[in-house]
A protein has these predicted regions:
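Active-site beta-strand/loop architecture of penicillin-binding DD-peptidases
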Residues: 385-433, 581
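Conserved, well-structured interaction surfaces
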Residues: 47-60, 85-163, 181-194, 198-216, ...
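Short coil/turn linking the two alpha-helices of tandem helical-hairpin repeats
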Residues: 160-162, 167, 211, 229-241, ...
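Membrane-proximal, proline-rich intrinsically disordered regions
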Residues: 25-72, 105, 565-582
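Bacterial N-terminal signal peptides that target proteins for export
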Residues: 2-13
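Long, intrinsically disordered, low-complexity segments
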Residues: 28, 46, 101, 114-117, ...
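Short, surface-exposed recognition loops and adjoining beta-strand edges that mediate ligand/DNA contacts
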Residues: 35-40, 44, 63-86, 169-172, ...
Length: 582
């Protein structure tokens, strides 16, 4: 009996120990690791999910710059890559085209990170749809959905501009887990624009004209972006032979005018001095309709700050401690600022190379915006005499010449956000500024034969440039000359287009628009192939540079868009198709 009782007690104890062990194991299995986001919990906080979508606006890097400086400028006649030589980063392929292939890693990085941004937006939309009203209330939820639709359209705009054939993945695809079943040629170019426009239109219909929190998108920004979309859509599909002057859709141009009416009659406007636009103390001024916000570590008390890492390579050699001297203005671009009697030298601007020298005025005069845009030897770097540029401030002059870009970096005395081993700046990135929107409007007005209105806008912009001498660039005053266009320059569409296109190049120079402008107008192959022939023979003080352009060639019907990255094509074989010619 004692043995039986003892055995029963022993079995009971063992059972209790086993149950206890299972409970302990279960506790360990249910342990929630730290520093990891729980998806279900995250979806319970829809406003934080919206913030995560906003955070992607500036979550880029020089290998995948969301401002597209390499694809908008380096791929055009405005800029050279820069750096220590042609093998410094893989962007050399982008500026010569002949070696450009789908295996370029930077293309895959850009595609991948832009789709991370799209995914953030889709997750935020699901969180808002499921938990928004309970957590935020109906009205705030409606507005947050509109904001996220704006952000998603913004990221798709970037994807469409670079890659053309991209899969439209929305919140329904995320819910259904069908992202890997959506083809990138499911929609035509026009249909894809319509999808992007629909997101911006929903944002426009809901958002207020002003927001109490800086950085949040608003109705006017949506209107400006809608105008940009209709402008791109209204010229054709982007490929030469099916885009340009013979393919302009007048109804789309009317939409551009309609939405820029909203911008024109809003709280935004021209900043009085052109140079102020690119100084950090004037961030979020009336010129700034939509900009990616950046900060330094002193502002947000973090180690690195929310710096602009897309421009991390673009500091000037020898001026900045980590200036790597990328994004170099071309001689052709500098020549475009030449004036005669205050007006552009349309026909002979590139016949002879020239550059101003500080303190040595000549008969050649210049549009004053040159001195706000391009850093040149003998002139103060960004208005500060203590940092005067010399030929030593070019890292590889025998390859990339002696000019430097000034708009995207602050004055040297203002310092950087972070400077070792990489350098970032707290400069906001303009996505749309007021003048750009007015140039969009002007382009549409010309296509609608409204030349008087178009001339007035361009002359307003030129008058601002004329007023932008004494405050910052008085040292170049005797080298500047700019006049307003007389009505004879706007007597017909051909003349008006020439004035608009020239003005856009000067006003928006080095702001990552040029390649896309030339594509829209159907002028890429003629412009770039002529540029390659000329720039390879250019000299600066007797020294040739840009010899690598001898191997450059733009192929129409192919190079208007960049290739779909190889890893994306072969992640799910057969799902995606390649762009023409690659």
């Amino acid at each position: 009996m004692k043995t039986i009782i003892y055995n029963n007690i022993k079995k009971a104890c063992m059972t209790l120990c086993l149950v206890g062990s299972l409970a302990s194991c279960n506790d360990y299995l249910e342990y929630k690791p730290t520093a990891v986001v729980d998806e279900q919990q995250a979806f319970q906080n829809p406003d934080e999910m919206v913030n995560s979508a906003y955070a992607m606006l500036g979550d880029d890097w020089y290998g995948y710059p969301f401002n597209l400086w390499t694809y908008g400028d380096v791929a055009s006649d405005d800029a050279l890559k820069g750096g220590s030589g042609t093998t410094d980063t893989d962007y050399h392929q982008v500026e010569v085209f002949t070696t450009l292939t789908p295996t370029l890693g930077h293309l895959d990085e850009l595609w991948y990170h832009l789709y991370i941004a799209v995914s953030r937006c889709n997750r935020a939309l699901v969180a808002l749809q499921d938990n928004g009203e309970a957590k935020l209330g109906a009205e705030t939820t409606k507005q947050r959905i509109a904001e996220v639709k704006f952000l998603r359209a913004h990221f798709y705009f970037k994807l469409k501009m670079v890659f053309n054939k991209v899969p439209w993945i929305d919140e329904d695809a995320y819910r259904n887990n069908s992202q890997e079943q959506i083809k990138n040629d499911e929609y035509t170019a026009e249909q894809l624009w319509d999808k992007i426009i629909a997101d911006f239109k929903e944002a426009y219909d809901v958002l207020p004209a002003t927001q109490s929190q800086g950085g949040r998108v608003n109705k006017v920004a949506a209107a400006a972006y809608l105008a940009k979309c209709y402008l791109e859509k209204g010229w054709g599909d982007g490929y030469e032979g099916s885009t340009g002057a013979n393919f302009v859709n007048k109804e789309d141009m009317k939409k551009v005018v309609e939405y820029t009416d909203v911008v024109k009659n809003s709280q935004y406007g021209y900043l009085e001095d052109y140079g102020d636009i690119f100084l950090p103390e004037h961030h979020n001024s009336k010129e700034s309709i939509f900009a990616v916000q950046h900060s330094n570590y002193e502002d947000d008390h973090t180690t690195y700050g929310r710096g602009n890492w897309s421009n991390v390579l673009n500091g000037v050699w020898g001026i900045w401690s980590c200036g790597w001297d990328f994004h170099k203005p071309s001689q052709n671009f500098v020549n475009a600022f030449k004036t005669h009697n205050g007006l552009p030298q349309f026909n002979d601007y590139a016949d002879e190379n020239a550059h101003p020298v500080n303190g040595a005025p000549s008969s050649q005069k210049w549009d004053p915006r040159l001195f706000h845009t391009v850093g040149m030897p003998s002139f103060p770097y960004k208005y500060e005499g203590a940092y005067t540029l010399t030929t030593a401030n070019s890292r590889t002059p025998n390859t990339y010449g002696y000019y430097c870009s000034m708009k995207e970096v602050p004055q040297r005395s203002k310092g950087e956000t972070y400077n070792s081993p990489w350098q970032s700046f707290a400069m906001n990135d303009y996505v749309i500024r007021y003048t750009q929107s007015m140039l969009d409007r002007t382009e549409a007005l010309i296509e609608l034969d409204r030349f008087v209105e178009a001339r007035q806008i361009i002359n307003d912009i030129r008058q601002r440039a004329a007023n932008s001498i004494n405050k910052h660039i008085s040292y170049a005053a005797n080298q500047c000359e700019i006049s307003l266009y007389p009505d004879t320059y706007f007597q017909n569409k051909e003349k008006a287009r020439l004035c608009l296109r020239w003005e856009r190049r000067l006003e928006m120079g080095m702001e990552h628009e040029r390649f896309f402008d030339l594509r829209r107008w159907g002028l890429l192959s003629t412009t770039l192939n002529n540029y390659f022939k000329k720039e390879q023979n250019d000299e600066y003080n007797g020294q040739k540079y840009a010899q690598y352009y001898k191997g450059a060639h733009f192929t129409p019907g192919k190079n208007e868009y960049f290739p779909v990255p190889y890893p994306q094509l072969y992640y799910i074989p057969g799902l995606y198709s390649q762009n023409r010619g690659y």
